Amino acid sequence: EGAKDADGIITSWGIRIDQQVIAGLEKFAVVGVGSVGVDMVDVDAATEAGIVVTNTPDIFIEEVADHTLMLLLACARRVKLMDKMAGRGDWYKGRPVLNEIPRLWGQTLGLISFGNVATAVARRAKPFGMHIIAYDPFVTELKMTAEGVEPVTLDELLERSDYLSIHP
């Protein structure tokens, strides 16, 4: 109702632009979505009404890559277990657990898909001394090798990876 006379709108999470909303827009020309996906917009209804739907394909690449590496480190260093031990006052019992944790240096990170996020993850993992392998049938071997990433088959990736990250 409030956007009925607007020329366009920028939307993001939680605001659904469905066929009913689109039908009530009189002079709307564009819906800009502040995310990679446009699943919160009924694109077919918008197209039929002559409304252009755009997205933001490069948003959050760096943030998702940071978060991915944070989760990898949390798993590798058993952060959840160590935090629970510290919370119980058993922090001093953590040394044997730490002795069982392998270094990331020399470990293999397998990436399924090698788009923008996976490329950013690979760049972050390299300084930790990780060997990076990737499988993506839609990306050239040249692009992967230019990033210092070894292209492999999916079966080989699953067999060789110590850690696995998927970024479709």
Model-derived segments and spans:
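Residue-level detector of anion-binding/catalytic polar loops
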Residues: V52, A74, R78, H131, ...
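Phosphate-binding beta-alpha-beta segment of Rossmann-like dinucleotide-binding domains, i.e.
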Residues: A49, P57-T108, A120-R123
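Short gly/ser/thr-rich secondary-structure transition/capping motifs
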Residues: E1, T11-G14, R88-P96, T145-P151
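Rossmann-like dinucleotide/phosphate-binding beta-alpha-beta segment
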Residues: V97-P168
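Short beta->alpha connector loops at strand-helix junctions that form conserved
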Residues: G34-S35, G50-E62, D136, L154-D155
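Mobile beta-alpha loop/short-helix "lid" or hinge segments that flank ligand
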Residues: M40-A45, K80-K93, M130-I133, F138-T140
